[in-house]
């Protein structure tokens, strides 16, 4: 037996893939002596050294071990409304839309869900949500996660929410530090210029036409809400000024003038049960989110309520929304165009269709003659796709969709070779690159193409090998030719085809399947958040600047398939994922491949304050081993004390 005064470690034999190998719970008395037993006889082989100490102390357990990364969060499946005929109907709406919208909020659950659904699902506009913080300082009704871990959970809930509203998600570096006494304090803690720079960067990147934000006064909620509103207001002019944050311009971004900016009216700007005919003050615009959409099978507010229910750690209602009046109110704050004080829509004065693109070539109509001609052709193909859409035979839209895709690609090539101004080229390319992605997805939906890259394991370690099975299916009577199939992985990973054939002709209802062997690089980076808490300021340090603003780092392994439909090539890209049955009620769960340490140690609590005379406290040590072969490991647990002052 190793006595408490003996510092010699004991070996710990780790069986393969043991998961949580051992949980050591020791009762600690203020004297430093384990209560009830002397020494360590646990088979886990952990040596603990206890020393006498001063009257009051802080006990910290220090382990030489790899920090346990954040656990992989479930990647939920797409909703049925994004698949089949309904998904194609949604996609065709996007093809004819040329405008974009962004909402700026302080925390997850501040957003106007019904409006996001209305603009994205109902009108096909590009929509985005810029949430300044990840909600790290909030409460958690589901589990023990707090602070940074809670921020990860709430970020994942936002991604689950966006399955309903279709919006893109962005974040700044701001840390949600909890209650604030003033806007000034919030700006000081976050760093005004740093967070304003993030907001400006995201606006310059996404280039929205209309931006809405939270109220800048007390009716908008807490100090974080008001601060976010003020920063968004300042970003209206800053994003358009090349002298503000010039380093972004040097990196390749260009200034962007938001056309109109609105502030929420009356707090959250959401009202239920009030008649849509009730008059509103001058300068206030009402959006009818209670309108019924037959494709969605409900109102925008109803689908928005389902989206909002994803904020489960914040105890959002799980009851489905009921049909009826639902509106959101917005006060015009700034505009780059002439406006009427009796607007009926946030996009009054802005073309929401493809003619929005014409605004980028004003004064260059002669040089842009080719573009104007191509744009008219594109609008015609979109119109024919709308006319030929048939829920029972969605592939009837393929001729129009393929023609539209070809026009977009030709326009992009012609713009590069044109004499248009650099600014015009930049903004047209920005919009048309998204349009090509939308046409690509629409063609795949019309064919009923399914790409399923499934890994045999969701958690892997450096140096390990795992299999990926890939299935490609054509669920329409229109044949396609699968020309290339590949896996894409980080540098240093090795990929090998191990069986099957996933290229060739794919007829009606046909499938192709194959297998790949993937070896993780010995020095592979662990899957973890790309942001890290800076404990000197309430702002995150960014570990990879290329990812700034994104919800999470991209999946490490992707499957990429190219197929030929008619005379156009279509490329599909899907993250390789692992599927499993969860321990709770529901359908299958999915997660992306996650790289974890082979050996992880977690101590709880990490810091313990235990005054003299206090009751015994429990210390828990969890060891997780992920490799397939057994190993011998030695773990030390030591006590560090310091006087209480």
Question: Residue ranges of each PLM-predicted region?
Answer:
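Low-complexity, acidic Ser/Thr/Pro/Gly-rich terminal tails and inter-domain linkers that flank the onset
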Residues: 415, 421-463, 579-614
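Asparagine-centered strand-capping/turn motif at beta-strand->loop junctions
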Residues: 472-476, 623-629
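Residue-level detector of conserved catalytic or cofactor/ligand-binding positions
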Residues: 632-643
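The feature marks non-catalytic terminal segments
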Residues: 238-443
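Bacterial N-terminal signal peptides
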Residues: 58-69
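Active-site rim/loop-helix segments in enzyme catalytic domains that contact anionic ligands
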Residues: 75-205, 226, 230-237, 241, ...
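Eukaryote-biased detector of low-complexity, proline/serine/threonine-rich segments
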Residues: 503-575
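Short terminal hydrophobic/aromatic SLiMs and anchors at protein ends
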Residues: 2, 14, 21, 30, ...
